[in-house]
Structure formats: C-alpha cells, structure tokens
Amino acid sequence: MWDGPLRSRQNLRTVAKLRSSGCPLTQSAIHPTTTSPSEGETASEILQGQASAGYIEEQQLPATSSQLEMSGDSNAASDNNVVIMTKRQRDDLSQASQAEVLSRLRTEDAQGPAENNGAQSDLALHSCDMEERVDSSKLNLNHVTVNKHSPPASKSAGISQQNDDGGCGASENVDNTTTAASKQRGKLLLDSSSSNCTPKQQAQQAVTQVPEWELSHEQERIFDIVVNHRRSVFLTGGAGTGKSHLLRAIIAALPLSTTFVTATTGLAALNLGGTTLHSFSGCGFVDQHTSTHQMVYRNVLGRKKARANWRKCRVLVVDEVSMLDAWFFDMLEYVARHIRGCRKPFGGIQLVLSGDFLQLPPVNKHSPKQETRLCFEAKSWPRVNPLVCTLSHQFRQKDKEFFSLLNEVRVGALTAPSLGLLSSLSVITTVSFVDEEKLKLKREVGAEAVDIITDSKGRTRRQRQDGFTILRARRSEVDAINTEKFGELDTEIYSYKGAHRGEGHFPSDLPSTVSVRAGCRVMLLANLDLSAGLANGSIGTVESFVSSKLHQTANPSTKDDLQHLADHMMLPVVRFDHKGKQGPGDGGGAAAGRLVVIEPHRWTMRQGDSDVSCSIQIPLQLAYAITIHKSQGMSLSHVNVDFAGIFEEGQAYVALSRCTDVANLVIENFDAQRVNPNIKALAYYRALEFVGTEHREAEKKLIDNGNKMNPWGPYDVEDFEASDDDNGGAVKKEVVENLTYDAENISCMVEQFRQRYMPQYIMFSTLRRRVLSNTEDAARVKGALLVMDTTSLLALTNMTGPTSLYQTIFTERGNMMRVPRVVKEELLFLASTDVKEVSSVTTPTLHSFCSTCSSTPCSTGFSYDFVEVVSCALSIMENAKCDFLLDEQREGEANSLPPVIQEWRSLSPLLMLNSSPDTGEKDAPSVIGFGERSREQHHSTLMFASFLVSRYSGNGAVYVCTETVELAARALAIGLRVCSIAYLCNRARRVN
C-alpha cells in the first residue's frame, strides 16, 4: 500500500476534485514530488490508511459545508467538493446545541440531496474520520431512541466488518463477515461511495440506529468520558456493578470500522461480540523468557491482517484486563507504537480497559512459582495513564444481600453476619455421615437402592451436585468428578487421541485423549465462531454422532485430521446451552439451542509466516465440573463450590461471584482462611481511593476542556511519521525508545501511594499467616478460661447448631467463659440501638472479622435481624451464667500489658500495643482498618486476660477467644494463647 505523505489542505482538495471528476488518482497529479500510489487505490483508501495510522492531523481533516455554516465562519477555506474546517471552527461547532444540529439535519433531509453530493460525501463523512462526524458529543447517543421507520443504512463499501477471529480487517481482500454484535453497533461513520443518501441523511440514519441504553448516572458520566471526550479509561468495580452493560453501550456508540473489541479470554470476548486480544494483536502466545519485544514485533509485522488491525484501530477495548500480564501489556504497547510509527502511547490508540484486579491474576504457565506482575505494574501504564472509573452501584436488587457479601469477600474484610451466612450455606463433606432413617429403609429395600451417606446437613452427594455446575480449584478434582459422572451413562463411547507434528510436544493444557458419549456434558475448548456463540468455555450436551463420510464437513482437512485422531469416522453433535441476551449489543448466542457438529481443531504455532508446529484434537472436554479459573467471566444459576482446594488469591471471590442467586449456591467446607485477596491489588485500590480528589479534578478538567485533551491525559508527546513498505519491511524512521510522560499524572501518583502502602500489606500478610498457624480450635481446648470478645460470641450464635457447639466447648470440654466489661457494654449497645448510620465496609482494608461497629452487619443488608443475633448472644451469656460457666470482669481485674515478645517485634508498627503509631507519613495512613475505639477494646480485653493469667495460670490455661486477626495477633504478640470458634481455624478439622 502506498504510504506517501498526504498532509496539506491543498492535497486534500486535489484528491476530492480528482475523485469527483473521474480522473485517475496518481501521485503526480496530487503532488509532483512524491511517488505514485499503487494501481487501483482510491482516495478513500489513502485517507483511511493515513488517518488510522495517525498521519493526518486533526485540524486537516475534511468537514461538510453545512458544518462550516453552523460554525459561523465565512472565511473558512472551501471547495466545490470538500471544505476544510480549521481547529477553531471545529471547537466552535462542538458548542452547537443538539437541537440545532438535529434541526438542520431534518431541514436538509427534507430539501432533498444537494447536487453533486456523491463526490462531496465521499470525504465528508469518511469512516476513518472519527472527529469529523456530526458532533456526537452533543447528540447524546446513549439516549437516542431507535427510529423504526428509518431505512437501514446501506452496507459501506471499503469498510471491513467483523472477521473470522473477531478483528476488523483493513483490506478489501480479507474475507469478512458481520457478527450479531457488529450489526447492533451504531454505524456513526459511513463511507458513502455505495450509498444514494446525502451525508446528512447518512448521519441521521446512523444516529437513529444507535440502540437505546438505560444507564445510571455514574455510567453516563463514564460513557461521556469515553465516547465524547476520547479519554483512555480503566473501568473497574465489583461483581454486579454493570461493567459489561456499560461496555456494550460504549461499543454500540463507537465507530464500527475503527473500534476493535477484545478480551483476554474467549468467553469474555464472546459476551462482547469481539475477539481475543492475542488474536487481534497477532502476537499469539509468547513466552517472556524466550521472546523479546523486538522479536514479537517482527512476527506481527509479517502478518498482513494483524498489521492492518493495528493501523486501522482508533479505539481498543480490552475486557478481563486483570488476567493481562504486565510484560504482555508492555509488549503490546511496543508493537502498537512501532507498527503505527508513532511515539504516542499505544501509537495514539484510545484504550478502554475493563476488569477487576481483585479477581484471578494472570496465569504464568511457563513459571508457575514465579510471581506474576499485574497490568498496572507495566512500565507503559503511566504513559497510557488511563482514567480509572470505578462503578459502585449494584443493579441486582434482588441480590442485594449477596452483593454485599461478595464485596466483603472481594476485599477480604468479612463481617460477622457475612461469616454467619457463609457458614449457614456450607456443609462439611470431608467427613461422612449416615442418615439413620435411610439406613433403616436401606435394610428393607436392598443395599443399592438407598444412598445413606450424607453431609453434615443430611444431603447426599447427588442432591448437592445434580443440576449444579461444580466449581473446583484443581484440575485433578475436576477430572475425578467428570470421570465419575461420565461413568454413570451407558451409551457408546467414542475416543479421540490428540495428534502433534513439528516442534515441541502436544500442549499440556489440552486433553491428550477426549472420550465422549451421548448424554454427557461438554465444554468447548476453542473459539470456533464467536458470531455463532461458539467460544472457548461454551457448555452443552452431546446428543448424537454423525459420520464424516456422509457429513459435509466445514473444513476440508476434517477427514484427514480425524484419521490421525481415531480409528472411526464419527463426529460428536452437541447442543449448546442457551445464553439469554442481556441487552443491545450482546454478541453470540446464534448457535445456542442448535445442534452443532464438532470437527477436529488445529492449534498452530507460528513464527513469522512459518508454521513450526500443529496440534490436532476434538475441542471438547467433560463439563460436569470445571475449574474456577475456567469459570471466570461465566454467569451460572446453580453453583457448587468446595473451599477445601482453593489455593489462589482471588479464587474464592471468583467462585462465589459466578452464582447469580444465593439461594442456588452450595458451599462445601467453607474456610475463611481461603478468602485471600491479592495484596498488590488491595494496595492499588487503596491508593486509588486516596487520590480520589485528583481523579475528580481530572474528570472536571477533561469535561471543561472539551475534546482538546489526548487519550492519555493533558500532557503532549512529540510525534513523527514512520511506515512499513508493502512487504512488511522495517520501519522507515526509528521510533525513539526514550519515551517520556508526565511524572505527576494520576497513574504515577497512584503507583507512588501503592508502593508506600505495600510494606504494610506485606507485613499484614505475614501477621495473618502467623495468626492462622498459631490459633487453636476452641472445640479442642479443655479445662481453660476463654476470654470472649464480641466476634466470638456472635460466631457462637451464627454457627449452625449453636446449642450443640456450646455444649461441646463449655460442657463437655469443661471450659469456662470470661467476658470483659467492654464486650458486654458493646453487646448491650448494639442490642438497644438501631445502628443504621454505621457505614458498611466499602474500602479494601485488611480489618478481617473486626469487632467494632464498623464491621457489624447493620448496614450490610442481610435479611435476618442483627439485633436478634446480638440478643441471642446475650441470651447465651445468661444461660452460661446460670450454668455457672460464665463470669464477668470486675473492677480492678486488669494488669498492664507485658512487652512484645522477640519474634513479633518486627510487626510492632501494625500492632500498636504501647503507643500511637507515628510513621511520619501523614498522607499514607495505616492500611489496617480498625480505629481507636477498636484498639481501646482490644487493650481492655488483653489487660483482663493478662490479669487472669497472673491469677489462675496455675489452675489451667487462659485463652483469648476471638474471630479477628487483629486481636489474635496482639494477644499472641504478648505471649497469650489464642483460640477460635469458627473462622481462624479450619472448620473441617473440628468434626473428629
């Protein structure tokens, strides 16, 4: 493709005149000193390539004559076919009201097309000219209602639609098809070379075809920032906050031809009607230990389609960015800059990133033990400087209680009622129980007729799993469940053994042997057709098999490939589950409910234009159970989760948040120790909270300045041209590597505070591990004095079967209950006060299981009355007093605290036992969430426990019984013993 300079206004006018007059477009006719374009290349293609690569300056882009009239400048440069609008005129035009713009559109439409409109429209509303369409910032696209009577827009010549891997090609030679999601996007920019409508009619049709979206106030604000102000953003928030809904609205409002929708997982890409990021970029799966940025760039440069994608792209959407490694992000930024020949961040591309760093981190397949770096740790992140937009409003009103619980699990700050609810949903399956009634029935009807083995709640395994999607942390557990369920069927089995040729071995993350039978549940392992809903992660049921000898296969290589996989020629026929659409813009789902023949799939490893290896297999695996990693991005109605195998940070949150209804959630072996958020992500979100004022000021400045700001913020980057030759050769002008950015931008500020918080988070992580390893089970303690705090009494109340647990700990084990004065005072206060004013935990702090009011459930929204729970705790205290098992603290029963023992002194800054902390960092407060009141309560409790140790240690042990990490750590630090009723010890171990 010819990439000669096309910079001046005169050149643009000349191109338009030549186009309208029918003269051939030669470079000599446009500019006497440049080389001729390739044969058959049109002015539209020239302008499109130049604008998408960042070569055409915004102030040189064309505008329609009517737009100039509205700008009010009679001195504007004009032409019979093309009128060039100056930057000042566009700024004036951007201030025109929505009513005025629409009024002029209707007026000109009623008057009919102007003479010679074909040549004028060709450049007036070109698909690559995003800034020069009718001012979308004033048309308020998200509120425009679809006009059912307006004719459909004609398919634009030269505009590539969604292709087979979800990307948008830049060449007419690419075989492109339109996805369902692509059809729903508003075609705001139309190339009119194949249209009989005037530019104004095209613009009006484009506006009326934008779907109507219902957005909240905070969603509208973010929508405006992305669509109208062209700012790169990072969209984040917890489950149920409307991230996907907002992304669909944004995608629908952006130009189809230059907006590329991607995700880090195939399923997430399906949900947005896009493609995987690896497929779009052309990078493939690369290893940072064996590949450099330059090597990847050269490979991408040799791929025509990927090269065209990067040059055509103006907006890049990336969902599930939490699974994007920092190295890969830096590599993408490097490739984008060099292919586009532009020093701007990502070569000037606007980024719309979405995800939650408190979900699963990136998977390091090559070095599993090596700590992965999250995306915000990338070197290029401060240059991109995305404006962080946090969604906090939840839209699942019926799931308000569950939403509150998920937010607490997300940040690892579980309150007493959340712990109680999770415990009530949990069953113990590490120990088998026998249903006595079913045992009698079994003796009567036969050994095989009745299942007598149950969990702790009397449910059999089949009752817990049938109809539920089983989520497990480890692949070995998933394989065992799938094998068992598969064996219950009696249909014929067809097996396929994977084949591999070329370098390396058959991929370890693919099943080497696939065995399926009619009636079994399966999951798709490849993105076969995103437009038809056939994405990696789609679940369905095998209904039958067809012979490839009789079946007309979609791929010519199917029969040959099948001969390498099996000694038969049968292909599975799968009916995939229906995926209900959630709103305009949803992609996929076309194949849901239909029978699909699954043919062998090829996974090819390429280096440049050469195939170095190829693996072939039927892209299916059994799906009765799936791994938690595989489930990220899914929405499941019935979920069974086992906490026993959870090992990864964020795994518990991802598993629980897959379920849409808490009533259909089964938890096996709940263990609060497994609720572990990533401390780097916690520090990042805490830093974001601390610079919230700066974020609000940045948003205000962005809106006040209109569209004058760059996608990466207010600072500017000196740009220069570079391009590749037609054969994908080297860049003509080397892109400077010493890249600069505003060192005081918001991303830099966030990173500075994150680094300042990290030592405290690391210290707390160490403290937490020590507490969990040294806390004893209260149900195993014998003949001791248990100093109870508020959380332990509430836990005793919330536990399933509190009466039996009370009997075990205090009657059978012979323990005595001792209650500090401050604990009883707090319980009485909570029982007699409506504490609705108390704010719930909304920030990612580390105050796990805190006993202060800020951690009590009054504001979490759970259905049961917390006052009743507190009253129940007081009732237990009265019963214990009547049983002579309880005694309360009396006046004078307190000793001063002993010094911190040697092994805990390194954690003294977090313990705050002897004096108020003074770190000298006034602008970076402690990450620990308990306040002064909590600290005073802990001190009073510990002083009472110290008194009991000095007085009764000869007659038995003294334990501090608590469910909070902070109090447990403070007690252990001064040499006291600690026990837990529920949450600081493994529940499963107590049932022995």
Curated annotation (Swiss-Prot):
- Reaction it catalyzes: Couples ATP hydrolysis with the unwinding of duplex DNA at the replication fork by translocating in the 5'-3' direction. This creates two antiparallel DNA single strands (ssDNA). The leading ssDNA polymer is the template for DNA polymerase III holoenzyme which synthesizes a continuous strand; ATP + H2O = ADP + phosphate + H(+)
Q: Which UniProt keywords apply?
A: ATP-binding, DNA damage, DNA recombination, DNA repair, DNA-binding, Helicase, Hydrolase, Isomerase, Kinetoplast, Mitochondrion, Nucleotide-binding, Transit peptide
Q: What is the name of the gene encoding this protein?
A: PIF7
- Give one Pfam family, short name only: Herpes_Helicase
Ranges where the record places region Disordered: 20-43, 145-182, 190-209
Function summary = DNA-dependent ATPase and 5'-3' DNA helicase required for the maintenance of mitochondrial (kinetoplast) genome stability.
Give the DNA-binding residue ranges. Answer: 651-670
Q: What lineage is on file? A: Eukaryota, Discoba, Euglenozoa, Kinetoplastea, Metakinetoplastina
Q: Which cofactor does it need?
A: Mg(2+)
Q: What is this protein called?
A: ATP-dependent DNA helicase PIF7
Where ATP binds, per the record, is at 237-244
Q: Which BP terms does GO give this entry?
A: chromosome organization; DNA recombination; DNA repair; telomere maintenance
Please give the chief subcellular localization of this protein.
mitochondrion
Q: Which domain of life is it from?
A: Eukaryota
Where's it found, cell-wise?
Mitochondrion matrix, Kinetoplast
Q: Which InterPro entries match?
A: AAA+_ATPase, DNA_helicase_dom, DNA_helicase_pif1-like_DEAD, P-loop_NTPase, PIF1_helicase
How does gene deletion manifest?
No growth phenotype.
**Which species does this protein come from?**
Trypanosoma brucei brucei (strain 927/4 GUTat10.1)
Q: Quote the biased-composition stretches of kind Polar residues, using this chain's numbering.
A: 23-43, 173-182, 191-208
> Where does the transit peptide start and end?
1-21
Q: How does it assemble?
A: Monomer.
Give the family, as the similarity comment puts it.
Belongs to the helicase family. PIF1 subfamily.
**What's any one GO cellular component for it?**
nuclear lumen
The molecular function terms of the Gene Ontology recorded here are: 5'-3' DNA helicase activity; ATP binding; ATP hydrolysis activity; DNA binding; magnesium ion binding
